[in-house]
């Protein structure tokens, strides 16, 4: 292995910050009028979290009418459970350990397998930054395969599969039997573009999950060294998921900031997190994040490998990269972005592009290929990479290193040449029973977005598609969460399984916490719009509940049911801050005399009154006839 040429500098300030990591950083979330609920599986240790939003009663002339609680998908882990004990220095509970032990196909290693991992574990300069509750890593027994795809193809339903089936179902099968949800569960028919979307919640079974994984249409990213994970699924025939990025850089951000940013991302609804750190203490930062993450963690291993060479792409070697893969797999990374489709012969195709190669990983591998005039070592060593992946159940996120960086370059020869190669690599990974998803663009004008989905389905055999947006225009720096959210909603509808968020700082700088919040909310919105459009069962429940609350002027319920309750309430209170305004039958937009919903209610009340009068007159007429129709008795 190549000896690393660069040793990260330590920071006394960062050590002091780590010493202060506690609930004081605001990691326990308090969602308004919400309750954490656990759905019980077939065994005691399958407890699936969801959040129920309680609603106020509706008051009519006939009295109070109860509004039922609304269940919502919850990614917040222990941070959203008021009863949970939280200690970032101890990490999260190991909910999967018993499942892993019972399968009997893994072994606890006596020590780390990665040379760099061993070096970091014994480096006194980083002792003050290390997570101290590290356990020995787990690996498949010799010659074994421990992937969820391997089990699914053998007809085995794992606890992870049952967990995600319950999680996707969100107890809507139970609610569909209750009369109080009858109107709320009505929704428009979706257009699924050939996807096999369940038509009723009771079809979302562990067996359905197993079949989707076995077919390669879905993955459960779940490294055996991430026992803290609450399993989730990424696939075309499930809810659209979103990924949030974080990571330090050589310019800014600290280890503590990244841990806080990870927890903050969960608060707003990130389904997975990618740690894209390129600055100091990459190894230690990742350990802290994984040990405290209830969601899958992804990385781009070539970033850390490059850091080990001092930033010199030409000095990258297969041995160095292999050791980095093992280092990260033994920490518990759930999926790797691997840019194995950037082939030497594709690089010249990008010469006429307006913005060339914009992927960091893609540009690193392109530079290596040109410097050595050899084929991409990630491609030539792909089978060996698969051997590592299946020993830890790390999923592939096959990187789009030649994705377009502007709409002018969208859907060009180099982009689709790489995509077709990713399809070839998908087939190769599947021969090893390694789980795969495919990364997609990028920057694509709206009229050409669907073509990307069609190409991916055809050439990558329905492996889950994972896209960065796409951005549908290039004229809005500072607003690229919106330009990309438009493309994301569309491509999610067409079949993309996971959307990688974009923040307002895209192309401008490293995002801070508020940028992360804005990016995640934007992408939760895009994913939800896609779920509505493709007809996911129960997707419209929350919309209907919020619409009913809006019509009935239940302001607090409107805030509670929204994706960002705090912001919704703060916008309302900017003009009507008084508590009485929370029950007023108008807002500051129209005022009390011009509110369309208030007028509609008055029209309905008037119509009801007229109807009552007509009924009264009709009843009197019938009574008059029954009494002989005499005017005077």
UniProtKB/Swiss-Prot annotation:
Substrate binds at residues 245, 274, 303, 339, 359-361, 400-403, 439, 466. One of its GO terms (cellular component) is cytosol. Binds 1 [4Fe-4S] cluster per subunit. The cluster is coordinated with 3 cysteines and an exchangeable S-adenosyl-L-methionine. Coiled coil: none annotated. [4Fe-4S] cluster binds at residues 587, 590, 595. Pathway: Cofactor biosynthesis; thiamine diphosphate biosynthesis. Zn(2+) binds at residues 443, 507. GO terms for biological process: thiamine biosynthetic process; thiamine diphosphate biosynthetic process. Pfam families: ThiC-associated, ThiC_Rad_SAM. It comes from the Bacteria. GO terms for molecular function: 4 iron, 4 sulfur cluster binding; carbon-carbon lyase activity; zinc ion binding. HAMAP family: ThiC. This is Phosphomethylpyrimidine synthase. The gene is thiC.
């Amino acid at each position: 292995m190549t000896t690393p040429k660069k040793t990260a500098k330590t920071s006394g300030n960062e050590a002091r910050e780590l010493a202060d990591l506690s609930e004081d950083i605001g990691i326990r979330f308090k969602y308004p009028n919400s309750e954490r609920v656990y759905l019980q599986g077939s065994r005691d240790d399958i407890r699936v979290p969801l959040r129920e939003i309680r609603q106020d009663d509706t008051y009519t002339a006939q009295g109070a009418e109860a509004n039922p609680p609304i269940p919502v998908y919850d990614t917040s882990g222990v941070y959203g459970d008021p009863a949970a004990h939280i200690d970032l220095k101890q990490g999260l509970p190991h909910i999967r350990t018993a499942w892993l032990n019972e399968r009997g196909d893994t072994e606890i290693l006596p020590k780390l397998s990665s040379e760099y991992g061993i070096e970091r574990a014994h480096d006194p300069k980083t002792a003050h930054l290390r997570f101290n509750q590290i356990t020995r890593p787990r690996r498949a027994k010799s010659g074994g395969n421990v992937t969820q795809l391997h089990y699914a193809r053998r007809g085995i339903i794992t606890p992870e599969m049952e967990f995600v089936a319950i999680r996707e179902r969100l107890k809507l099968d139970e609610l569909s039997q209750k009369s109080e949800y009858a109107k709320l569960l009505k929704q428009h028919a979706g257009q699924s573009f050939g996807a096999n979307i369940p038509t009723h919640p009771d079809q979302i079974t562990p067996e359905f999950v197993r079949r989707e994984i076995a077919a390669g249409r879905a993955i459960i990213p779940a490294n055996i060294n991430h026992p803290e994970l609450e399993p989730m699924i990424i696939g075309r025939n499930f809810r659209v998921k979103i990924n949030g990025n974080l990571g330090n850089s050589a310019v800014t951000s600290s280890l503590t900031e990244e841990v806080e940013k990870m927890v903050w991302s969960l608060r707003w609804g990130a389904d997975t997190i990618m740690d894209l750190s390129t600055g100091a203490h990459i190894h230690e930062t990742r350990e802290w994040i994984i040990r405290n993450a209830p969601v899958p963690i992804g990385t781009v291993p070539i970033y850390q490998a490059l850091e080990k060479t001092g930033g010199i792409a030409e000095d990258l070697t297969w041995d160095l990269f292999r050791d980095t893969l093992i280092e990260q797999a033994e920490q518990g990374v759930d999926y790797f972005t691997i840019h194995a489709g950037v082939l030497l012969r594709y690089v010249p195709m990008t010469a006429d592009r307006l913005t060339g190669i914009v992927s960091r990983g893609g540009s690193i591998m392109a530079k290596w290929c040109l410097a050595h005039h050899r084929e991409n070592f990630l491609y030539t060593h792909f089978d060996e990479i698969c051997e590592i992946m299946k020993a830890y159940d790390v999923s592939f996120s096959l990187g789009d290193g030649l994705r377009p960086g502007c709409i002018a370059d969208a859907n060009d020869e180099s982009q689709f040449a790489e995509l077709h190669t990713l399809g070839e690599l998908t087939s190769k990974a599947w021969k090893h029973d390694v789980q795969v998803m495919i990364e997609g663009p990028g920057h694509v004008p709206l009229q050409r977005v669907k073509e990307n989905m069609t190409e991916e389905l055809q050439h990558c055999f329905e492996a889950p598609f994972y896209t960065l947006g796409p951005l549908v225009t290039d004229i809005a720096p500072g607003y690229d969460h919106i330009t990309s959210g438009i493309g994301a909603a569309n491509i999610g509808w067409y079949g993309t399984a996971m959307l990688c968020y974009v923040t307002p700082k895209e192309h401008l700088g490293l995002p801070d916490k508020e940028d992360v919040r804005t990016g995640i909310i934007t992408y939760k919105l895009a994913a939800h719009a896609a779920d509505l459009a493709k007809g996911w069962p129960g997707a419209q429940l929350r919309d209907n509940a919020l619409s009913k609350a809006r019509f009935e002027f239940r302001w607090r319920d409107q805030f509670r049911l929204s994706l960002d309750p705090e912001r919704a309430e703060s916008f309302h209170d900017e003009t009507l801050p008084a508590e009485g305004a929370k029950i007023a039958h108008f807002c500051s937009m129209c005022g009390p005399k011009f509110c369309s919903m208030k007028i509609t209610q008055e029209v309905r009340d008037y119509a009801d009154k007229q109807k009552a009068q007509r009924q009264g007159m009709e009843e009197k007429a019938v009574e008059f006839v029954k009494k002989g129709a005499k005017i005077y008795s």
